[in-house]
Amino acid sequence: MKPLVDEKHSSVIGHENIQEIVSHLKKGHNVVFLANHQIEADPQAISILLDPTYPGLAERMIFVAGERVITDPLAVPFSMGRNLLCIYSKRYIDNPPENKAAKQLHNKKTMELMSQLLKKGGRAIYVAPSGGRDRQNAEGVVEVAPFDPQSIEMFYLMAKKAETPTFFYPMALSTYDLLPPPETIQVEIGEVRQTQRGSIHLAVGDAINMENFPGSEITNKQERRKARAGYIHSRVCKDYQNLIV
């Protein structure tokens, strides 16, 4: 992975926020990164970007990932040496239908483990609420995929239930050019992968207030969750635009 990265022209934005995060973790608090996701090697990309200034931070991060990172032979190497909690995403949980119940049980057990980790504290967790990688639109522009309100709500509720101080931060990643995903989402394993060398970028924004945000006054729970997801998504999109200019 590292030989593909043009480190000289890569960048990290938001050092003051990352320093704040390191301080939270030292105190035994939890940090949850709500991030976009562009390539299967994002965990390695994060390490390459953070290790020089924040040694150990990326290494201790727990990545909530789709099951393909451990079932697709070509994806497995990208996740080796990472702390993973694997779940079945909504788009794959029904395929094949006869395995749906087993997949749901697996997801339930994974979320129970996540709750235990949050309760212990001192955890840094990466979550991509989109449930998948960013892709190009019809004009060939890479767009940050929409965030799932229910996914964000689930992690927020687990954090509150843990009763350990937990802080949420937006993270924007620009890694797409290194290993672009296929234009369409494939159900079957075996997508084509083409790599190229280039720069990568990461931004960590200010902590997110999960209770006070544009639309937090909405009384309908579902609509309020949508407003929060939209707000967090807009924060990540704004930081992402700053990375690619």
Protein language model annotation of sequence segments:
Residues 1-31, 37-50, 58-59, 69, ...:
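Membrane-anchoring hydrophobic helices of lipid-metabolizing enzymes
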Residues 41-43, 70-74, 95-96, 134-137, ...:
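Short, well-ordered, mixed-charge alpha-helical segments that flank or form enzyme active sites
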Residues 48-52, 143-145:
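Glycine-rich, phosphate-binding/catalytic loops in enzymes
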Residues 100-245:
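Non-catalytic C-terminal accessory region of glycerolipid acyltransferases
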Residues 35-39, 65-70, 172-177, 206-208:
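Short, flexible loop/turn elements at secondary-structure junctions
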